């Protein structure tokens, strides 16, 4: 009985770092599962802002906020353009006032988008999403060094007078 208790204590002392590590990993996985990835990233960026350079972090947050705001503006613009198209096809006397109001809203939203894009230098991506400006990778260079000349050229084996001088 005493040997079993001693063995358990030894195993527990040796395994405690591994058990703690496994427990921490399980907690991290549960944390990530519980929250969405966007919430986790916002929590992580808020922790970084308290530690790091405030100007750079606020600029990053403003850029991501600008991107989401710009995407919502574009979505509302598309909806207003659809509404404008349906009003133009109707062309009744009652719709004239609504048509003018919707056209003014479309122009205002388009001006906001243009102002936004010029201020933040946001480039539309091929899928219609908006992302940061694209910087192409630098051109590839030859990474292998120039081959050095062989100091000793290879000699053919001397088959006929091998061992004879």
From Swiss-Prot:
Compartment(s) of residence: Membrane
Record keyword Transmembrane helix present: yes
Biased composition (Pro residues): 133-154
Annotated region (Disordered), positions in chain: 123-156
Keywords of this entry: Coiled coil, Membrane, Transmembrane, Transmembrane helix
Residue ranges the record marks as coiled coil: 67-119
Domain of life: Viruses
Membrane topology: Single-pass membrane protein
Keyword Membrane: yes
Transmembrane segments: 15-35
One of the record's GO cellular component terms: membrane
Major location (coarse): membrane
Name of the protein: Uncharacterized protein 084L
Organism: Invertebrate iridescent virus 6
């Amino acid at each position: 009985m005493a040997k079993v208790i001693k063995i358990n204590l030894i195993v527990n002392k040796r395994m405690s770092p591994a058990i703690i590590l496994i427990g921490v990993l399980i907690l991290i996985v549960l944390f990530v599962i519980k929250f969405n990835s966007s919430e986790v990233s916002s929590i992580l960026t808020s922790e970084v802002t308290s530690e790091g350079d405030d100007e750079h972090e606020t600029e990053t947050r403003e850029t991501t906020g600008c991107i989401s705001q710009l995407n919502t503006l574009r979505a509302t613009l598309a909806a207003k353009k659809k509404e404008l198209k349906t009003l133009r096809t109707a062309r009744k006397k009652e719709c004239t006032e609504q048509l003018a109001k919707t056209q003014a809203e479309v122009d205002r939203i388009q001006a906001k988008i243009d102002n936004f894009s010029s201020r933040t230098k946001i480039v539309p991506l091929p899928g219609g999403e908006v992302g940061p400006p694209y910087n192409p990778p630098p051109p590839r260079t030859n990474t292998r060094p120039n081959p050095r000349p062989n100091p000793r050229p290879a000699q053919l084996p001397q088959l006929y007078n091998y061992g004879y001088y």
